[in-house]
Regions:
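Alpha/beta-hydrolase-fold enzymes
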Residues: 1-16, 139, 159-263
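Short, surface-exposed "cap/lid" segments of acyl-processing enzymes
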Residues: 36, 43-114
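Alpha/beta-hydrolase active-site loop
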Residues: 120-140
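Gly/Ala-rich beta-loop-alpha elbow adjacent to hydrolase catalytic centers
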Residues: 149-154, 158
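Short beta-strand/loop motif that positions the catalytic acidic residue
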Residues: 295, 301-303, 307
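Short alpha-helix in the alpha/beta-hydrolase fold that links the catalytic acid
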Residues: 311-320
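Catalytic active-site module of serine/aspartate enzymes centered on a nucleophile-bearing elbow/loop
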Residues: 325-372
Length: 453
């Protein structure tokens, strides 16, 4: 091809014309797309408020199957941002995924604290609010223990709650939960270090921690993407209605952050982040030590390989601290938010999570079905729900071989022999009725079906 000295200029001119035409096309649809962004709907799965306390609302989602699992799931989200990230859009909704798998699903919507709430601490959120919600869900389901699924800060609080109230939790699921903060490689660990940051000064200034303060901090962890790249990508995809709608839903969620109660913020930053007290098993809430060894029921950890907020090493070491011998970790190539909204996570991760809860919940025994759990004093202790052959062998070593022996023994002796918590012993006692209970003994009563873990 002969050399054309004008080719470069002609190519540049052609590219300019194409770019102008492209810009004109995008400009023509911009008003329509802007309207979509402004009116986009989120959190569309039908639910009713079944319990309220202060600002808190407990949501119960409408079932999507004819039959539901006997053991309900209570979803505990973080105290920051709105929980509808778990129900962002119908085809990428964790809530719907659980419902479609036959689970009975509840979720706590914390809503925004007022200035009057700035003195609420972790004790209030864990031992009052979460505990009251667990009791409400359990009562509505006619059960004595339920499943928990905690996300982010909600996962941390769920772990704390479970350690304090193990008898009320059948199985514990944790998503991107901050549980261990020592050399995790996470930016937040460095930024939240007591060497550089004092949460008390923030709270002394604001009372409650403003949502804008938190949002800007998270955005600055990846400033190029959060302040520039994503808007360029939006512009390049204005012609795609689906892309714009997905973008709008996420932006709405990011824009609707909520303030965080001041005292809870200080306690969380100082105790969990800076002092790593939960992982070191030295945390105290409400004057009671949070012994993570009490977490002896099935535990599931869902972690994102590329989670820049809660890296895998801020979650996985916790598995070695709990008292459970049934611990499962699902680590997936996604980020902190991607695990709840990405199409690949919904395809690869959530079916496994649904199955995990199903397999560890069983068909269950309701609290009013006493006739199914009536035993003679001479019955082998292994027949008690939750004991099984492993614990029965341990108990036999100290002479506890029958239902009558179990009734006569004190909780401390049983717990030490079996290698479980006294809370778990209380579960065993509640799970049966001895038809010939001796005078002065401690009869049990029927309860939920507890796994032998």
């Amino acid at each position: 091809m002969p050399f054309n000295p004008l080719s470069a200029s002609l190519d540049a001119g052609t590219n300019a014309i194409d770019a102008a035409a492209d810009a004109t096309t995008r400009a023509s649809i911009l008003p329509e797309r802007a309207a979509e962004i402004a009116t986009i709907e989120v959190g569309q799965t039908p639910a009713e408020v079944v319990y309220e306390e202060n600002k808190l609302e407990l949501l119960h989602f409408e079932s999507r199957t004819e039959e539901q699992n006997d053991v309900p799931i209570l979803v505990v989200y973080a105290l920051i941002n709105r929980p509808y990230i778990l129900d962002l859009q119908p085809d990428r909704s964790v809530i719907r995924r659980l419902l479609d798998a036959g689970h009975d699903v509840y979720m706590i919507d914390w809503n925004e604290p007022s200035r009057l709430d700035q003195h609420l601490g972790l004790d209030d959120y864990v031992n009052r609010y979460i505990d009251n919600c667990v009791d409400e869900v359990a009562a509505r389901a006619d059960r004595e223990s339920i499943n928990l699924l905690g996300y982010c800060m909600g996962g941390t609080m769920s772990a704390i709650y479970t350690a304090l109230h193990p008898e009320k939790v059948n199985a514990l699921g944790l998503m991107a939960a901050g549980l261990c903060f020592e050399n995790t490689g996470g930016v937040l660990e460095d930024w939240g270090s007591e060497e550089y940051y004092s949460p008390r000064e923030v709270v002394e200034t604001y009372g409650n921690v403003p949502a804008e303060f938190l949002d800007d901090g998270f955005a600055l962890m990846d400033p190029v993407d959060n302040y520039l790249s994503k808007y360029i990508t939006l512009y390049e995809n204005l012609e795609s209605e689906e892309f714009v709608q997905n973008f709008a839903r996420m932006e709405r969620w990011l824009d609707e952050g909520i303030d965080l109660a001041g005292r809870a913020y200080v306690e969380f930053l100082e105790k969990i982040y800076q002092n790593n007290e939960l992982y070191h098993n030295t945390l105290e809430i409400g004057g009671e030590r949070v012994d993570v060894g009490n977490i002896d029921m099935p535990v599931l950890q869902i972690v994102g390989e590329y989670d820049h907020l809660i890296p895998p090493e801020a979650s996985k070491p916790f598995n070695e601290m709990v008292g459970s011998d049934d611990v499962t970790t699902i680590e997936y190539a996604t980020g902190h938010i991607g695990m709840s909204v990405s199409s690949s996570a919904h395809r690869e991760v959530w079916p496994e999570v649904c199955d995990w809860f199903h397999d560890r919940s069983g068909t269950g025994v309701h609290t009013d079905e006493k006739e199914d759990n009536e035993f003679e004093a001479e019955a082998d202790v292994a027949v008690v729900d939750g004991i099984g052959p492993t614990y029965a062998d341990r108990l036999a070593g100290v002479g506890i071989e029958t239902i009558g022996d179990l009734v006569d023994a004190d909780d401390e002796t049983v717990a030490e022999a079996a290698g479980v918590t006294e809370g778990r012993v209380a579960e065993w006692r509640r799970s049966f009725v001895m038809v010939d209970t001796p005078a002065g003994a401690k009869p049990g009563r029927s309860t939920a079906d507890f796994d032998d873990h």
